[in-house]
Swiss-Prot record:
Full protein name: Adenylosuccinate synthetase
Role of this protein: Plays an important role in the de novo pathway of purine nucleotide biosynthesis. Catalyzes the first committed step in the biosynthesis of AMP from IMP.
Catalytic activity: IMP + L-aspartate + GTP = N(6)-(1,2-dicarboxyethyl)-AMP + GDP + phosphate + 2 H(+)
Binding site for substrate: T298, T299, T300, G301, R302, P303, R304
One of the record's GO cellular component terms: cytoplasm
One GO MF term attached to the UniProt entry: GTP binding
Disulphide bridges: none
GO-annotated biological processes: 'de novo' AMP biosynthetic process; IMP metabolic process
Length: 429
């Protein structure tokens, strides 16, 4: 039995999609365990660039089973659009499985998300307005509608009618806007369910059977540890658990069946949306990193905030996710910067802090303690091993490993699949 979890160690957008796609080649099952279509990842397969938001990266390998686990919230309309997007490009989706326990995003979730965000004024948290948060709210409140309900005409109608009483009261009383009628949603979304039905099953059984038969299973996380609802920079977080522990809850696979956890990070830091960001750069170097690294959100198109590598953040990710391996991406983006900085600690009121404070007022006032390293000018985009890196680039990578306490198992020197290099096979480690 060999199972690997891929986790983002920063605020998302670390290049997980590329790494997952790379590792998918040697997996027999690829599963997502949390989030929804708020997470975008770009994959280059067969020389063609694809943008996915919901379907696992392994979909391009038709012999591999791809799972949307019970921990996700699924917008049926968005899922069907993504299926059509793949079908139009000649990609088969017969290998997709969707959990019958996954919760469904409905039009009132989208409307609630947009209205709530607008009402917060200067206190916006930067939601993608995809209905993710409200769907998870309903799940926790035990009024959510699951895939199994969507396929049952009577159950779906009954639950929809019940929910609309509450949702319409919210829209009318709180936001002074009209709600929805059952007729506006029911037939359309029931039909969506019928189109998805061929993919729906108990995915916990699929995954556990695969593991019990010694198949390699890859669990694909979305967002990143710093966006985790428990361990991230709350409330500037997502509504689920991207940490490795989310695998057990979000797929129905026991923790003892997880063998390796690969943390993915960039050689610098980026973030979309609001919230504290200790190493953020507002100068010309920040602009250079953003443009060279093409730091714009896959889902939103928003420019990402960028900053120096923060080892405090990645150490935090190591601890709460049990990281065993590190994939260091986008090293090439730093080429040409004369002096590089790595944050080794924070300073607050004259005191040095080695961990991420839970109090965001404190985190917002933390000043990064930097260690400086010399940069490099050489083109590294064709490098295939750590030994081939220029001395300064190699020392930078080694220092990242030392400061985070995680061994480098993979590194990338460009956006393409063939620019990702293996240092250690995570399936056999």
């Amino acid at each position: 039995m060999s199972s690997v979890v891929v986790v983002g160690t920063q605020w998302g957008d670390e290049g997980k999609g590329k790494i997952t796609d790379f590792l998918s080649e040697h997996a027999e099952v690829v599963a997502r365990y949390q989030g929804g279509n708020n997470a975008g990842h770009t994959i280059v397969f067969g020389g063609v660039k694809y943008k996915l938001h919901l379907i696992p990266s392994g979909i391009f390998y038709k012999e591999k089973i791809c799972v949307i686990g019970n921990g996700l919230v699924v917008d049926p309309k968005a899922l069907l659009e993504e299926l059509k997007y793949l079908h139009d490009r000649g990609v088969s989706t017969d290998n997709l499985r969707v959990s019958n326990r996954a919760h469904v995003i409905l039009p009132y979730h989208l409307k609630q998300d947009e209205l709530e965000e607008a009402s917060k004024g200067d206190n916006k948290i930067g939601t993608t307005k995809k209905g993710i948060g409200p769907a998870y709210m309903d799940k926790a409140a035990r009024i959510g509608i699951r895939m199994a309900d969507l396929l049952d005409r009577e159950a779906f109608k009954e639950k929809l009618e019940r929910n609309l009483v509450e949702k319409n009261r919210l829209f009318e009383k709180m936001y002074d806007t009209e709600g929805f009628t059952v007729e506006e949603i029911f037939e359309e979304y029931f039909e969506y369910g019928q189109q998805i039905a061929q993919y729906v099953c108990d995915t916990s059984v699929v995954l556990n059977d695969a593991l019990d038969n010694n198949h390699r299973v890859l669990f694909e996380g979305a967002q990143g540890v710093m966006l985790d609802i428990d361990h991230g920079t709350y409330p500037f977080v997502t509504s689920s658990n991207p940490i490795a522990g989310g695998v057990t809850v979000g797929t129905g696979v026991g923790p003892a069946k997880v063998t390796r956890v690969v943390g993915v990070c960039k050689a610098y830091t980026s973030r979309v949306g609001d919230g504290p960001f200790p190493t953020e750069l507002h100068d010309e170097i920040g602009h250079q990193i953003r443009e060279v690294g093409r730091e714009y959100g896959t889902t939103t198109g928003r420019p990402r905030r960028v900053g120096w590598f923060d080892s405090v953040v990645v150490r935090h990710a190591r601890r709460v996710s049990g990281l065993t391996d590190l994939s260091l991406n986008s090293i090439d983006v730093l080429t040409g910067i004369p002096t590089l900085k790595i944050c080794v600690a924070y300073k607050y009121n004259g005191e040095v802090i080695d961990e991420v404070p839970a109090n965001l007022n404190i985190l917002a006032k933390c000043e990064p303690v930097y260690e400086e390293l010399p940069g490099w000018e050489e083109d590294i985009t064709g490098v295939k091993s750590l030994d081939e890196l220029p001395e300064n680039a190699r020392k930078y990578v080694e220092r990242v490993s030392e400061l985070t306490g995680i061994q480098i198992s993979m590194f990338s020197v460009g956006p393409d699949r063939n620019q990702t290099n293996i240092v250690r096979n995570v399936y056999e480690a």
